[in-house]
Amino acid sequence: MKSPVSDLAPSDGEEGSDRTPLLQRAPRAEPAPVCCSARYNLAFLSFFGFFVLYSLRVNLSVALVDMVDSNTTAKDNRTSYECAEHSAPIKVLHNQTGKKYRWDAETQGWILGSFFYGYIITQIPGGYVASRSGGKLLLGFGIFATAIFTLFTPLAADFGVGALVALRALEGLGEGVTYPAMHAMWSSWAPPLERSKLLSISYAGAQLGTVVSLPLSGVICYYMNWTYVFYFFGIVGIIWFILWICLVSDTPETHKTITPYEKEYILSSLKNQLSSQKSVPWIPMLKSLPLWAIVVAHFSYNWTFYTLLTLLPTYMKEVLRFNIQENGFLSAVPYLGCWLCMILSGQAADNLRARWNFSTLWVRRVFSLIGMIGPAIFLVAAGFIGCDYSLAVAFLTISTTLGGFCSSGFSINHLDIAPSYAGILLGITNTFATIPGMIGPIIARSLTPENTIGEWQTVFCIAAAINVFGAIFFTLFAKGEVQNWAISDHQGHRN
């Protein structure tokens, strides 16, 4: 019986179909059970891996508040008084045993931003190594190294700003290989019609890690002192590493406890999608317009993501004037929404493809449009509703939540167009997508010298415009099928 939505998806003869070029599509196998399966065990272990990863990344944002002498930061106070104070100031009494440092706002900016200078370097090398040697050890040791460096943060702070900046850059080097390595592993583990579910579960750990680590770091600072923030998350990272090394394999063929049926299901579903080339087709890859569609979308999405990740607490405090307890909670809520959206959108995307016969390209386009234009609309709205606290928080939460749709959009399109080189492709796109983390907050701060509502409207409008441009570019030039250059030595390929 013809699907009632089949007319909405590209037909077999259309350019946007999901047909594998040159080779015949493998027959669709009956999915192996989900319960206790090796592929879902990998998804949940990687979920906790990215939970740890983002906990290690963002904990400094909270600890830094307790590390810096309040007398040093008082002169940098740029609170806007356009909005009335949301509630009476609360005198926060907490443990004062942690050492204090006299770092001004510019120095703190260098400390927080130094992470990205290491992070951007290892993206492409990480993808290349993972595609050649597998992603298990690379991802595991990337997080393990970051955890070890995190344990040395208090010592580096005592040595001085230079040592702490260098340590944060080393943490960035370690984390830079993780996403490309994970993509490379999923190229061997994720059946095409389960990619959205499996990858959204994996990467959703990053959002939940942000939600949990921000308030938890505050609690640790409150009851103990800031040094224990780094000791706690560093030890958690080491424990995860031990579990990862013991329980995970690079491929279904090398997994010790996978059932024969599940292994055959995965291998048969990936038949004719993986390349037998020994060399990486760099030239055709870099000339591929579908790859650059992902680059533009990834860059655009991250501009908004990193701007909010680093400056949302500032907006809550200096413009909306929430107190520190409210700020910590409300800054984490949007990422809880994003986490839920990632999980649910992954289920929805694969159901649309498997049960309703929507094409991969259609799903990737629509989910990217929702996940980029939706946040743009609500981000602009948040800037223009003035001092309405409830609406401002609601719009910022909705904006960040809708961004979760992108986890089943452009974020995993690398696996659709070139599964054999997915790690390398993610390394390329994430290299460009790291740039907003380096320059976006700097530009935003330069546009908000007085922290007025009008200045923040400009920041939000710029981010929204970049998001919309990225969504349109991806919609026009993305593809949903494996490209010719990714499966053979054939030098020509369709764009």
From Swiss-Prot:
Tissue: Significantly expressed in lung endothelial cells, and much less in liver.
GO molecular function, one term: symporter activity
SUPFAM superfamilies assigned: MFS general substrate transporter (SSF103473)
Matching Gene3D superfamilies: MFS general substrate transporter like domains
Glycosylation sites: 71, 77, 95
Protein's UniProt keywords contain Cell inner membrane: no
Motif interval(s): Dileucine internalization motif: 22-23
Localization terms from the record: Basolateral cell membrane; Cytoplasmic vesicle, Secretory vesicle, Synaptic vesicle membrane; Lysosome membrane
Enzymatic reactions: N-acetylneuraminate(in) + H(+)(in) = N-acetylneuraminate(out) + H(+)(out); D-glucuronate(out) + H(+)(out) = D-glucuronate(in) + H(+)(in); 2 nitrate(out) + H(+)(out) = 2 nitrate(in) + H(+)(in); L-aspartate(out) = L-aspartate(in)
Annotated CDD domains: MFS_SLC17A5
BP-aspect Gene Ontology terms: monoatomic anion transport
A GO-annotated cellular component: lysosomal membrane
Keywords assigned by UniProt, alphabetized: Cell membrane, Cytoplasmic vesicle, Glycoprotein, Lysosome, Membrane, Phosphoprotein, Receptor, Symport, Synapse, Transmembrane, Transmembrane helix, Transport
Function: Multifunctional anion transporter that operates via two distinct transport mechanisms, namely proton-coupled anion cotransport and membrane potential-dependent anion transport. Electroneutral proton-coupled acidic monosaccharide symporter, with a sugar to proton stoichiometry of 1:1. Exports glucuronic acid and free sialic acid derived from sialoglycoconjugate degradation out of lysosomes, driven by outwardly directed lysosomal pH gradient.
Entry similarity comment: Belongs to the major facilitator superfamily. Sodium/anion cotransporter family.
Official protein name in the record: Sialin
